[in-house]
Regions:
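Conserved beta-strand-loop-alpha-helix junction that forms the acyl-donor binding cleft
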Residues: 131-141
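Conserved acetyl-CoA-binding loop of GNAT-fold acetyltransferases
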Residues: 145-155
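Amphipathic alpha-helical recognition patches that constitute DNA-binding helices
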Residues: 93, 111, 128, 139, ...
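Conserved acetyl-CoA-binding loop-helix of GNAT-fold acetyltransferases
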Residues: 105-119, 142, 146
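GNAT-family acyltransferases
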Residues: 1-108, 119, 123, 128-129, ...
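Alpha-helical elements of the RecA-like P-loop NTPase motor core of helicases
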Residues: 27, 141-142
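Generic leucine side-chain signal with a strong bias for well-ordered alpha-helical environments
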Residues: 16-18, 144-147
Length: 196
């Protein structure tokens, strides 16, 4: 499958689906967002429907990002993105993931990540998926470790925060061979549907 086409697919699992991000997701994302959700993100929380639409437009406008809305039932619960697809090195990053607090601790983040991992490895053909998170975000670090991601290192002063301080980031990764063996926190067949 051609990679660009692969980024336009809806990814469906048993509890949620990932839809390519669109302007129509703005109201749902705004309802899911609050200051605690955005506490460890390197950009400010959009506080109005106009700001959320601008945020979506910016997310869609960058050549290095392929964003998705996380949809549970018919409710937009959050977002996650593929970043920096590098076909030469065979790697891609998953990041800019956030969910409304209502879905914290429900398994939605893990399911979304597993859908994205399966799609990156099996449909898009990448050999490595990387992640990075704020060193201060213990919840995110634990979630990545439960997925089976390895801690690759710490990068100091990696991203400026909205308050002007600098974020140190912990880098993680999972290799395709580990994922296929089930070392990546998910058995090879998890009922993932690569819908249209």
């Amino acid at each position: 499958m051609e990679r660009e086409t692969g980024f336009q697919q809806v990814l469906a699992g048993p509890g949620l689906r990932l839809e390519p991000l669109a302007a129509g997701h703005a109201a749902g994302l705004l309802a899911a967002a609050d200051d605690e959700v955005f506490a460890h993100l390197p950009y400010p929380r959009p506080a109005s429907i106009q700001e959320m639409r601008a945020w979506i437009e910016a997310a869609l406008g960058g050549p290095q990002r392929r964003p998705y809305a996380i949809v549970i039932g018919e409710v937009v619960a959050g977002t996650s993105s593929y970043w920096y697809p590098d076909p030469v090195r065979g790697q891609i990053e998953i990041g800019s993931t956030w969910l409304g607090r209502r879905w914290w601790g429900t398994g939605a983040n893990a399911e979304a990540k597993r859908l994205m991992l399966a799609h990156a490895f099996d449909a898009l053909g990448f050999a490595k998926v990387a992640f990075r998170t704020d060193v201060a975000n213990a919840r995110s670090r634990r979630a990545l470790e439960r997925l089976g991601a390895h801690r690759d290192g710490l990068v100091l002063r990696d991203w400026p925060r909205p308050d002007g301080t600098w974020r140190d980031s912990v880098y993680y990764s999972i290799l395709r061979a580990e994922w296929r063996r089930g070392d990546g926190g998910s058995p090879p067949d998890m009922g993932v549907s690569h819908g249209s």
